[in-house]
């Protein structure tokens, strides 16, 4: 590898590291509700479900669909963390308000139901930079740990 290639690679790694830190901050800053003194962790667990779907190669492109497979991963994570289940329809729809996750399709939907989300939303997608970051296993693992630590998610 030439010195020029190395400098270019270092610039790329530095840029990706900056982008990773930016998105990690955004993910940890998702808006959550507090009900009866407890923070609802639906959005963080939904994000973890997406990470797991990428890991299992169920998501091969930046098109996140409301599927039974994704919902099963989401529900199993709720059980692993011992949290009270919040339906996936809420984070699937409302994560769009956090700036890095977007919906493509025919809406607005006032009160999302799984049926309406499947019919009206073609797919959800991340910012392209975030999607590229999530293709690297080490970044997914670091994000998972950060989410678990920040939102105090402990596997039971």
Q: Where do the language-model regions lie?
A:
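Intrinsically disordered, charged low-complexity linkers and terminal tails
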Residues: 1-156
